[in-house]
């Protein structure tokens, strides 16, 4: 595929935020998984990507003529503490290409080796975490949730030393961009307002061109990002997704989910659900995600204040008013999504709100599996109550709720279109990654097949729809990606 061309727009327009760098040589690259559907959408030949030259591209060891791989600079608040210089410590932006729909897309490597931003790290990644990101990001895409995509995972043949010696790997990731709130924080901390302005103009052109001609395009950018993030967080909440590390460097300007390190899907409904081993205070718990998103957006607004108005007081007022809309956008998206999950899309929101509040309390008090409940409720919409009733200990309380729900009308077929049968359940993810680390990719491939077709129940996949057995115990995740 000799005609492949990768642009270097980010590096060209924002050289202060890009360090030209090369991926470390992979001694024995071996393709583990390739996303044929995504490759086709990008105009890439999947057969060529499987060739030795294609695999070398996927690890960054052979790039097209004219391509300028760079490590991107960004800052960020990590668990509330500000770090002025983070950046791509083990990642590289190979460049941008235009996909079949005319959209510019980043082609990005993760685990490609030490960069100037690596600090004490080795810049490498292991097979398990890279396969994990591939699996979960593609599941999120199948669920209709904006996300970075995964093109491939390649084992490098290089050992990676962690608590033990693991097999190294590189993830080839595709995204609308890798611009983050932390990108703006990095630009702002330099004190160079012109750099912040150029970054904002780059973001507008890339993601929100509709605001370019507005009276205040920079305020328009902020409002657009607030709206996109409100929609995104609501979609997370609707499927029980817990990101786990909502630092400002992990909040995108595009409104896509990024960085799947300690993420997981909630089993039994509980707003205090935390999986990350490093989130000991529950900062990024499931129920805290909307407020954390608003906090992150406030940090974004701080970087844009000089662009909003020369008068700092007026700039702050503009920012506060715009940020205030985040909560309204989020609540609107969440309410509409929950109405769809309950089959009540034609019912007025005020009639649904008390029903939803009561339901969430019942789910929490009875320790009900979040995903299983909504699929079982779809059966109740068709007249089969027993599967969903069988989930509850407090039958009297649930039966009363069920009567109230039935009185509002319901649409079981519509419910099945939005309530997944299959999500990346934590015990199945661990099972698949353990097998893959031992050289057996079949469990990974079967799980991937299930979660990338999440809404249609299929024979032979019953265990992929079931909650974890009690013996699985309390789940903890680690930031391996």
Curated annotation (Swiss-Prot):
The keyword Manganese applies. Keywords: ATP-binding, Magnesium, Manganese, Metal-binding, Nucleotide-binding, Nucleotidyltransferase, Transferase. Its EC number is 2.7.7.-, 2.7.7.108. Its cofactor is Mg(2+); Mn(2+). Disulfide bonds: none annotated. InterPro entries: SelO (IPR003846). ATP binds at residues 87, 89-90, 110, 122-123, 173, 180, 259. Coiled coil: none annotated. It catalyses: L-seryl-[protein] + ATP = 3-O-(5'-adenylyl)-L-seryl-[protein] + diphosphate; L-threonyl-[protein] + ATP = 3-O-(5'-adenylyl)-L-threonyl-[protein] + diphosphate; L-tyrosyl-[protein] + ATP = O-(5'-adenylyl)-L-tyrosyl-[protein] + diphosphate; L-histidyl-[protein] + UTP = N(tele)-(5'-uridylyl)-L-histidyl-[protein] + diphosphate. Mg(2+) binds at residues 250, 259. The active site is at 249 (proton acceptor). It comes from the Bacteria. The keyword Metal-binding applies. GO terms for molecular function: AMPylase activity; ATP binding; magnesium ion binding. Belongs to the SELO family. Nucleotidyltransferase involved in the post-translational modification of proteins. It can catalyze the addition of adenosine monophosphate (AMP) or uridine monophosphate (UMP) to a protein, resulting in modifications known as AMPylation and UMPylation. NCBIfam families: PRK00029.1 (NF000658). This is Protein nucleotidyltransferase YdiU. It comes from Mycobacterium sp. (strain JLS). The gene is ydiU.
């Amino acid at each position: 595929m000799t005609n492949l061309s990768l642009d270097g727009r980010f590096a060209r327009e924002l050289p202060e935020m890009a360090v030209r760098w090369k991926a470390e040589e992979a001694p024995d690259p071996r393709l583990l998984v390739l996303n044929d559907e995504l490759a086709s959408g990008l105009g890439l030949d999947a057969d060529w990507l499987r060739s030795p030259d294609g695999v070398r591209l996927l690890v960054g060891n052979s790039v097209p003529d004219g391509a300028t791989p760079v490590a991107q600079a960004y800052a960020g608040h990590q668990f509330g503490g500000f770090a002025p210089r983070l950046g791509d410590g083990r990642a590289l932006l190979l460049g941008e290409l235009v996909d079949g729909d005319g959209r510019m897309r980043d082609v990005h490597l993760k685990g490609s080796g030490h960069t100037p931003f690596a600090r004490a790290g080795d810049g490498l990644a292991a097979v398990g975490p890279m396969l994990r990101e591939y699996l979960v990001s593609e599941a999120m895409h199948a669920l209709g949730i904006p996300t970075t995509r995964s093109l491939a995972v390649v084992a490098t043949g290089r050992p990676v030393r962690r608590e033990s010696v693991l097999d190294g790997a590189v993830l080839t990731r595709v995204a609308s961009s890798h611009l983050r709130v932390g990108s703006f924080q990095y630009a702002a901390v330099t004190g160079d307002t012109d750099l912040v302005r150029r970054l904002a103009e780059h973001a507008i052109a890339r993601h929100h061109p509709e605001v370019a001609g507005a009276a205040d395009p920079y305020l328009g950018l902020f409002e657009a990002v607030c709206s996109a993030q409100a929609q995104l967080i609501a979609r997370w909440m609707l499927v029980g997704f817990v990101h786990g590390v909502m630092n400002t460097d992990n909040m995108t300007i595009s409104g896509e989910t990024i960085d799947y390190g300690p993420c997981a899907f909630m089993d039994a409904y509980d707003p205090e659900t935390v999986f990350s081993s490093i989130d000991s205070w529950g900062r990024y718990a499931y129920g805290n995600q909307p407020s954390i998103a608003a906090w992150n957006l406030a940090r974004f607004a701080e970087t844009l204040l000089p662009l909003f108005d020369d008068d700092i007081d007026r700039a702050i007022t503009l920012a506060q008013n715009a940020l205030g809309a985040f909560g309204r956008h989020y609540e609107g998206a969440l309410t509409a999504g929950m109405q769809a999950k309950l089959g009540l899309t034609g019912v007025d929101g005020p009639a649904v709100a008390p029903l939803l509040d009561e339901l969430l309390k019942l789910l929490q008090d009875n320790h009900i599996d979040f995903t299983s409940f909504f699929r079982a409720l779809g059966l109740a919409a068709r007249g089969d109550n027993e599967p969903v009733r069988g989930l509850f200990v407090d039958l009297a309380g649930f039966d009363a709720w069920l009567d109230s729900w039935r009185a509002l009308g319901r649409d079981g077929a519509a419910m099945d279109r939005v309530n997944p049968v299959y999500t990346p359940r934590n015990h199945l993810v661990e099972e698949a990654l353990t097998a893959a680390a031992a050289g057996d990719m079949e469990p990974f491939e079967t799980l991937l097949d299930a979660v990338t077709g999440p809404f249609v129940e299929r024979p032979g996949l019953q265990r992929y729809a079931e909650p974890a057995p009690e013996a699985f115990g309390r789940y903890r995740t680690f930031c391996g990606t």
